[in-house]
Amino acid sequence: MTATHGNAKHAKPAKNPSKGFLAGLAALAFLFVTVSSARAGDRYALVVTGASGGDAYAQKYATWRVSFVETLRGKFHYEPQRLIVLAETQSEGVPIATRENVRRAFADLRARMTRDDQLLVLLIGHGTSLDGDEAKFNLVGPDLSASEWGDLMRPLPGRLVVVNTTGASFPFLRKLAGKGRVVLTATDAAAQQFETVFPEFFVRAFDDPAADLDRNLRVSMWEAFTYASAGVRQWFEQKGQLATERPLLDDTGAGIGREAQNPGTDGAIARVTYLEPDAVLALPADTRLAGLMRRRAELDTQLEELKARKESTPPDRYDADLEKLLVEIARISAQIRAKS
């Protein structure tokens, strides 16, 4: 029997939100997704190709570096002052990849970045395992260990995306993982020191429409990782070899990492992390509006994290948390729209 207006106020609220109600909230939140679908701020990149050890390797590393830098400059419009490139041999605008130049680059980034900015660090080259717990990225001259890279990154404000594509790269995941960071490595063990094919497919991901799994015309770090991981598996299958290269991603800060086929709790941050800047996301001069945009970005991330935990969360708890987030997203989005 339908409740009347007279007794409607005494009706008990439903224990769980209805699917229709949640769907309505989701649709409402989606109306505002173009206002702020990721965090605002500038994008920076440090791309390093280290000591090659031979002409064949040098040519491959240079090809991957040049291709990726062209993507950042041409497709994603990275400004020259926000894109630092180091290589085995010096050329115009590209210093040698020495320990001193790496340290100088991080000092420069630390002075220029803000908490709203994002830095990508891409390492292409050879890696060396020291004792199973530590590894080095081979530079021209003295190398830097994973711990030393961590020390250089620790003072940086903003968000970090670190991609180490070398053999023996797993210790970098353990040493560099942290809150607000997305860390990718080409291997799941320090003992895997063979030459890797992961960088070839990672670089290719940002120019291949097939990498855009959700068809939103952007390739997230999760999508690039998934694409590259599939490329690695297919490469070994075509060679008829047992896969010895297993890429990992960590964005929970646990320092454990997961494969693309078994993400567990990892992947929520990576799914909403993009390399390309978006003019829509530039923070406005209006401090109130800027604060709303930051809050919306935080809620987007929380929503992705919640979705990643769905299988391990009791249904009642999941629905309640989802409702709370969607209501808040809709509220903040409406305020942004009113001020835009």
Residue ranges and their predicted role:
Residues 36-43, 58, 241-340:
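Disordered regulatory segments flanking catalytic cores
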Residues 51-59, 88-96, 134-140, 186-192, ...:
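Second-shell loop/turn segments in exported
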Residues 66, 160-253:
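Active-site-proximal C-terminal subdomain of hydrolase catalytic domains
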Residues 37-120, 127, 134-136, 143, ...:
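Boundary/activation segment at the start of structured domains
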Residues 56, 60-67, 71, 97, ...:
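Extracytoplasmic/secreted proteins, especially bacterial periplasmic and envelope-associated proteins
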Residues 53, 66-80, 107-114, 154-158, ...:
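Sec-exported extracytoplasmic/periplasmic mature domains
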Residues 51-55, 89-93, 125-130, 142-145, ...:
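Solvent-exposed loop/turn segments at secondary-structure junctions
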Residues 4-34:
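Short, low-complexity, charge-dense intrinsically disordered segments
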